[in-house]
């Protein structure tokens, strides 16, 4: 879950993935089956586990913790898994290079219940609740930049605060009926509600100075100005619906699957957001005046977005697919073909998406699997895509479209008597009817028009295994490019063009003291091309073609985390004695050092416009 109105990386909160509840996670960069929905990019499937006996686990740290418990009846007919998490990143955020009071609090609760009535009927329920509160009171911020010949210093003084709230509730109740070994029916009833509030009123005054490179003494100020940012944005999203799925398996190697889904949506959006920039007696943007004269016109807002929208559309989708496993000589083959159709009555659009997958596992001494998949995929529009630059919902918006081809290889092998797995995926996507967007910090704002096309290609690799006997580690690397062509002006990098990324998780321990462990997490990624100052057109709206004239990439992202831990109890290698301690499956005490080398990373630039020179300073 990620809030819709989020604009700052500090507001993101916790991932919906709770490691205490998840059994397995499957990720695909594309080319997935028809039953997995309408998405143009990637697919993430999360499988929850069922406990087999009573269990209790917890984790505590200086920024929060989590507590989870699992229950199971003696006959295993009823199982329950419950988990709650809390996080407050005060200690981390207040170490930033700025005088700001932060009070971010994130909490959530998840539950997974199962009850097997008999061999034919089973019930289950998944529930999720989260509440994110983000309060920020900025005071002072100072940044030194420039060159040795022209050192600059920006001092910003703030007044006001930001107070945001994000609440989310969702649940799915499932009835599963299996009359015999060949047929299986599943009925899901689900509900979802998301309530978000983004309120801020912050006035800021800045002073841009230069210094004598020899003496270090300040010289006359370049610019003095002020800015007021104001927003009262509210969003309420409610979705209710049902889904019926059926699978027919005439034999263990063949599946026919069909599904129908009905959703009733309710979106209520109220937006009132504006920004005023002022400098020495005039506001910007401003009309041209002669040097030394003041602009006699009234203050003009740099931008103003206001809109009130309330829609209650209906979305219907269906899919059918066929899967088959068989032998071709000594080679194992898997094929899947399917088609998916969806209709949304808000824009009265129907989309049809054919897809196919083919995999072969040769009878080689090497354990390898090759897979090719592809099809036509759509990104069905929702709240962000349908909202235009005036704050209104656009009923003429269309689904973004892509044609995809994905090649994949899995290679399992042994090295120094330890098991390893290498996965590699190559993909190419030709995209059409794209909606241009820009990124302000982590906020994505769409233009509301299908006036772009593009393409993407890349390679992902991951090596997983026991680099050190008994503990798992992994290394991953990827290279990808994403381009778009807005109104036929030529190819340009999209704001999320990732390029190169490398990450590693490595675990080790002392041979004589295996209970003493250390882990190292290393991440490096090229900076995104979203470091461009947001340019406004004559109507005060973002100019999505401005990057054709100027585009700046953010600095590369670099981070190293180090963890130290002592395993007191491990029922596999370090069993505990005593009636009480023997009940513990694992007991570990550890210290995690985030960003161990204190590397400063840039998620986004805050651009300051020097009206005297016309330059933008990041």
Where are these predicted regions, by residue range?
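Short acidic/polar hinge/loop motifs at secondary-structure boundaries
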Residues: 2-27
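N-terminal periplasmic accessory domains that precede
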Residues: 10-15, 30, 34-55
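Transmembrane beta-barrel wall of Gram-negative outer-membrane proteins
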Residues: 63-86, 99-138, 162-191, 251, ...
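Flexible loop and strand-edge segments within Gram-negative outer membrane beta-barrel domains
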Residues: 89, 100, 122-123, 127-178, ...
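Membrane-embedded beta-barrel scaffold of Gram-negative outer-membrane proteins
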Residues: 184-190, 197, 399-457
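Structural signature of Gram-negative outer-membrane beta-barrels, strongest in the C-terminal barrel
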Residues: 237-239, 251, 261, 302-429, ...
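Gram-negative outer-membrane beta-barrel transporters
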Residues: 326-331, 428-430, 449-535
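C-terminal beta-signal and adjacent terminal beta-strands/loops
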Residues: 470-473, 523-541, 566-618
